[in-house]
Amino acid sequence: MPYSDKMAIESEAPKRCPECHSEHLIRDYEHGELICADCGAVIEDSFIDQGPEWRAFDSDQDERRARTGSPMTYLSHDKGLATEISWSNKDYYGKRIPHKNRAQIYRVRKWHQRIRVSNAAERNLSLALQLLNDIGAKLGIPKDIKETSALIYRKAVEKNLIRGRSIESIVCASIYAACRKVNIPRTLDEIAKASEVNKKKIGKAYRHLAKELDLNLRPTTPFSYIAQFCNKLDLDKQAIVISEDIVRQAMSMGISSGKGPTGIAAAAIYIASVKVGKPRTQKEIARISGVTEVTIRNRYKEISKALNISISE
């Protein structure tokens, strides 16, 4: 990329992370992303893509497949194929637009937005995908998971599965389904907190999508949550290994059958934290796992009795 073009892009980019307000931002031109080095949030993902998303094995194939512009994305209602007009009052080279021309540019932007979103269906899709992006940013999920979420949501729209349900609940259910599809654990509680949508509504919408779209998602296990919960509790690898060993033994004895995976994982971590000399209270673990202290206490009693584990509480 020419130096002047790169400077123009950098001048339009945010200077501060909207999540943690850090100014330590990293520009990844290869992937077209602006990333916060402190919290890991992807602040922008629409920089010019300089590399192809295809492979070519000879020069003829390379010429046939050559293209200009960003690759298609499900995260935009028009799949990223339309032209974008920036809202900053600067031109391509980063120079400020004269005051006498700003009113004209504003009218062009306004009509451009109207043309891009021309009917109610496109307007609703645009709002839903913006919401999906916002929730995804709060959860810290990568772009490929957001793409999968957007694809699931689009399929739900095509099959008219949103009728009678809120857009917010279907968006949240799509994110939850996408996370389960690639085995990236995100609990309903986490998604509910990030979206401010009722947990029960998300669960109901998810079951509706899973059935109607035939998602065939594997059930989650306690192993899916152990590393995530331990990291949030600042527990090391040793605690993770012990927690997984406890869960493995509990599952082999049938203790986990019919029980929620997050509750089993939370109880195992509670035991492991004491064993490694870094005890965490049931209240602390309940807060990060999204299960109640009563659930952790009940699972802990069942596991410790079956495995003959004794710890000083």
From Swiss-Prot:
GO terms for biological process: transcription preinitiation complex assembly. Sequence repeats lie at residues 130-213, 224-305. The keyword Repressor does not apply. Pfam families: TFIIB (PF00382), Zn_Ribbon_TF (PF08271). SMART domains: CYCLIN (SM00385). Zn(2+) binds at C17, C20, C36, C39. One of its GO terms (cellular component) is transcription preinitiation complex. One of its GO terms (molecular function) is DNA-binding transcription factor activity. It comes from the Archaea. The keyword Transferase does not apply. A zinc finger (TFIIB-type) spans 13-44. Stabilizes TBP binding to an archaeal box-A promoter. Also responsible for recruiting RNA polymerase II to the pre-initiation complex (DNA-TBP-TFIIB). HAMAP family: TF2B_arch. Belongs to the TFIIB family. PANTHER family: TRANSCRIPTION INITIATION FACTOR IIB (PTHR11618:SF13), TRANSCRIPTION INITIATION FACTOR IIB-RELATED (PTHR11618). This is Transcription initiation factor IIB 2. It comes from Thermoplasma volcanium (strain ATCC 51530 / DSM 4299 / JCM 9571 / NBRC 15438 / GSS1). The gene is tfbB.
